[in-house]
From Swiss-Prot:
It comes from Blochmanniella pennsylvanica (strain BPEN). Gene3D superfamilies: Bira Bifunctional Protein, Domain 2 (3.30.930.10), Nucleic acid-binding proteins (2.40.50.140). This is Asparagine--tRNA ligase. GO terms for molecular function: asparagine-tRNA ligase activity; ATP binding; nucleic acid binding. The keyword Plastid does not apply. SUPFAM superfamilies: Class II aaRS and biotin synthetases, Nucleic acid-binding proteins. Pfam families: tRNA-synt_2 (PF00152), tRNA_anti-codon (PF01336). The keyword Lipid metabolism does not apply.
Amino acid sequence: MNVVSVVDILSGHVSKNTEITIQGWIRTRRDSKAKISFLDLYDGSCINSLQIIAYDKLHNYKNEILRLTSGCSVIIVGIIVKSIGIKQHVEVIAKNIKILGWIEDPSTYPITAKKHTMEYLREVSHLRPRTNTIGAVARIRDTLSQAIHNFLHKQGFIWIPTPIITACDTEGSSKMFCVSTSETQKILNNPNEKLHHTHDTTYDFFSKKAFLTVSGQLNAEAYACALSKVYTFGPTFRAEYSNTNRHLAEFWMIEPEAAFMTLDDIIILAESLLKNIIRILLEKRSDDIKYLVDKINKNIITILENFSEIKFNHIEYTEAIKLLEICNRKFNNPIHWGTDLFSEHEKYLSEEYFKSPVIIKNFPKNIKAFYMRLNDDNKTVASMDILVPGIGEIIGGSQREERLSKLDQRLQENCLTQENYWWYRDLRRYGTVPHSGFGLGFERLMIYVTGIKNIRDVIPFPRTSKNINF
């Protein structure tokens, strides 16, 4: 049985007049007066569907073929022939069609041929990958993931899996999910009973506080200080109640860490990474991107093509603040030296002032994490954010503080104890080395390359406050 995919056939990898077997789902069925049915078949291998010609001589034509509706799964044996239509150059004449799965009640099937809003599709996240848009997003996500792995491997980086359950707060924030088993059985027995918050972890699984990770960075640093170049690519969690199109409670991060690298080194690495993976995306997923041009954003191809060639602007945080203070714009969030940049500030700089990606360096230490290297002015840290038009911040990074005395000072300033970070301090006690790294928010990258406006539509099953239905 010569099983092939739709993309194999449409790309010309299978010769005409070849008998093949193809499996997939029905997108649409059209019947002609000549007792011929035209079936559009998709299997997820590409954005396009394949036309299947079903003649009435098929043994199950009347009883089954004429009952096929959108979503039915089938396995088809047929011959590839030249198409007489203009939509595609080949089609398949069916010799046998076996129905694997019916739609129980087509009138209640949530995914019909008509156009659905993205809001509606979120309510049926388990079925939305059957739509062209979400299918395209999934393939783009896969291609970007592979491109990131390949780029970093070629640069000599080693992939390291870091813990999802952790005892450390990487960012020094309170927006963490606690992991506890102390009341698990009670909740399982009575799901409607509220959890009684307690700080007593004596009888808990780990006998101490545990959290879902907000970053794999600290663990990656440990391996970078032995293997030189490492990266982590995995899920991270933030207990943020922000109900915006830019925030998720669960999202994916790419976090390279490299020994002997400075802030300037990782800026070069980050810019090169972004340009490389977008160039590969244009090469490998042109059909999916062209589809999104028609459905989502007509300018997305131009934006991506320009991205690979455009020069990133570099400015100091202090300079960025001056630009924001003197611009003729009234912001909702007042800005002055020492405050962090909000989304409106980031978008003004990248979309209106520079009209291109911009890298902001050397932020005040009071608005950045404890692990960032203190600059000689004792006011700022060796940090950087990369802003892109339409998104704002897409990458954040820094040179890490390799000096134990300075690290202890920063821990104290952030009301963090040396005891909780004992192993992280050990990295400075035993053969410390300058090292740097950054974090790339994968879903924000997905928003940029697809033109989709809501971050909940570029991840398979979005997790947000009061939303965990799947």
